[in-house]
Amino acid sequence: MKDVQLELYTRPTCSDCQAGKAFLAKHHIPYADHDLSKHPEKEKDLRKLTGTRMVPTFVFKEKSLLGRLRKPDVFIGFENNINEIRRIVMEVD
């Protein structure tokens, strides 16, 4: 199993965010949920990662063999990126 951490940037009114969360729950994938309505300071991190404020944003962080973090895989949107997200999740699952 890969050592992957997932951070998810969301807003409660975003239907694509809710679909992404449901998918992760179905597959029992742990993640850090950054609800931007509750933690507006996280928008700065989101902009730094993506250059935008769009949600949902999935950030998969993987450690190398030496324990260093590799460049994260970042996906904006669930529906448009479901195949890539599924591939990463199934590798971890």
Question: What are the language-model segments listed below?
Answer:
Residues 1-29:
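Local sequence-structure signature of Cys/Sec-based thiol-disulfide redox active-site neighborhoods
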Residues 57-58:
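Short acidic loop-to-beta-strand element that houses the catalytic metal-binding Asp/Glu
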Residues 62-93:
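Non-catalytic, surface beta->alpha helical segment in thiol-disulfide oxidoreductase systems
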Residues 36-54, 64, 86-92:
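Thioredoxin-like thiol-disulfide oxidoreductase module
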Residues 11-14, 36-37, 79:
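Short, surface-exposed acidic/glycine-rich loop or hinge patches that mediate macromolecular interfaces
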